[in-house]
Amino acid sequence: MADTPSVEPTRIDPKLLELLVCPLTKGRLEYDSARQELISRSAKLAYPIRDGIPIMLPEEARPLAE
């Protein structure tokens, strides 16, 4: 039997989260560990985190449902 590696969600350093802002609104971001995204409520966008790296490009962000 092959063991499948367990994938643990990446943790974001709280200090990094304090420094990062939405590139469009310059507002604060919320970390969604379940979806591995940084949420900008003001821009209504969710920026993905890939391999532990936040992708802060608006064209890569997912629009949030109203």
From Swiss-Prot:
Gene Ontology cellular-component terms listed: cytosol
Highest taxon in the source lineage: Bacteria
InterPro entries: Trm112-like
Annotated signal sequence range: none
Matching Pfam families: Trm112p
Family stated for the protein in its record: Belongs to the UPF0434 family.
HAMAP family named among the record's database cross-references: UPF0434
Name of the featured protein: UPF0434 protein M446_0487
